[in-house]
């Protein structure tokens, strides 16, 4: 298959070629060709596009999607799949907490403790060290997601889904229906990539609570969140006594 690793091997004219550098250089070139609608990518496989495929893909890319909708999907993945805890335990009691991504509340607000994630869509001023330290002094813990392509993957998927929804696909020529069917499969792969990228973004995130930057180096995404949340909940509840 025409995936990135195989293309690097095909282009190698020297066995001593620095494959990592070539891989990144080639990825950049392929991304530019995708942006110009000359080629497409499904998962890890690249392919040349026909004129009809180029036309449909260009219309896809021109489709506008709402930032709030993308953030809402990020919240569903984080709080619905990756970290689905609804309460934290302190002593013998369970306490509910608010779940938030950027400025979007997920679920019902309780008015108590809050766990908030900042995404690539949030304003840069929200992520300054001073602002993070200051905002996390009260009842809010803040997680600044690491730099992974979760946002771009969800945006690409949403554009495809919205484009298809706006078209009467059953009345299109069979060739166009086949292209759209392939793009729907591509959208599902983008969504899977976004979930994986969000896990990595949490594992590489910065966590702020009680006006401090809490550094937890080991563990997967859920374990890191649980550990950081446990530390902060002890700090927060201790301030009550």
Go through each PLM region and give its residues.
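Extended alpha-helical scaffold and adjacent linker segments that couple domains
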Residues: 1-241
């Amino acid at each position: 298959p025409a995936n990135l690793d195989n293309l690097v091997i095909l282009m190698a004219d020297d066995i001593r070629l620095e494959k990592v550098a070539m891989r990144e250089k080639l990825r950049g070139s392929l991304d530019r060709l995708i942006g110009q609608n000359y080629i497409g990518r499904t998962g890890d496989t690249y392919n040349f596009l026909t004129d009809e495929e180029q036309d449909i893909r260009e219309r896809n890319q021109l489709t506008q999607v709402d930032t709030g909708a993308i953030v809402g999907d990020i919240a569903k993945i984080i709080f619905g799949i990756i970290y689905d805890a609804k309460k934290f335990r302190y002593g013998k009691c369970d306490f509910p907490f608010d779940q938030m991504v950027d400025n979007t509340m997920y679920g019902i607000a309780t008015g108590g403790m809050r766990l908030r994630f900042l995404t690539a869509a949030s304003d840069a001023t929200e992520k300054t060290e001073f602002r993070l330290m200051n905002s996390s002094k009260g009842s809010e813990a803040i997680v600044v997601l690491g730099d992974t392509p979760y946002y771009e993957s969800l945006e690409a998927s949403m554009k495809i889904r919205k484009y298809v929804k706006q078209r009467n696909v059953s009345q299109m020529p069979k060739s166009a229906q086949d292209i759209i069917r392939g793009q729907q499969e591509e959208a599902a792969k983008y969504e899977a990539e976004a979930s994986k990228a969000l896990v990595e973004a949490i594992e590489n995130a910065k966590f702020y609570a009680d006006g401090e930057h809490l550094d937890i180096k080991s563990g997967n995404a859920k374990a890191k969140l649980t550990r950081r949340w446990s530390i902060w909940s002890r700090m927060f509840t201790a301030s009550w006594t």
